Amino acid sequence: MKTVAVTEDFRDFPTFDAMMSEAFPPEELFLPSDMAKLANVRIQAYYGDDGAPVGMAVPILLPDAVFLELLVVDSRQRGKGYGSQIVNQLLERFPGQTILGYVERPDPSRPDNEQRLRRIRFYERLGFTVHYIHTRQWGIDFLVIAIGKGQDDR
């Protein structure tokens, strides 16, 4: 898998913007082409061995941790291990650091509840701890996830 640092002149914005639009509901959508304009954001695009775009991650460096603002894998590439590879690369890139993120809180009344549960299981398989502390953004409840220093490492 090849990793590319995304800059404002990134040629594949349309592909990755479409990937995001498919993966996230409108209230959570922040397109990579808009994210790249922010000074503190470092977007990483990932490509398979065949050169096809497979995913994207947005790690934000904080003083004592790394915040994983975004992880997305193209729907046609899911189930092939790319998400795990991306997370493992981030763990290698930031050794000894706590990596924090968030996932949507399960809600049986929501039509996307199964997708929310799948995301939680994905992170748990990789060794993340789900903290039942929630935060609310865009009218959505999220749970905090973490791995690394002070967490139940894998």
Segments predicted by a language model, with ranges:
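A short helix-loop-beta-strand connector motif used in the catalytic cores of GNAT acetyltransferases and
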Residues: 36-48
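Conserved acetyl-CoA-binding loop-helix of GNAT-fold acetyltransferases
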Residues: 73, 79-93
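C-terminal "cap" of GNAT-fold acetyltransferases
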Residues: 115-116, 132-154
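Short acidic/glycine-enriched loop/turn segments that link adjacent beta-strands
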Residues: 40, 64, 137-141
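Short amphipathic alpha-helix that is part of the acyltransferase structural core
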Residues: 1-31, 47
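Conserved acetyl-CoA-binding loop of GNAT-fold acetyltransferases
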Residues: 119-131
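Conserved beta-strand in the GNAT
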Residues: 45, 51-60, 65-72
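Conserved GNAT acetyl-CoA-binding A-motif
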Residues: 94-115
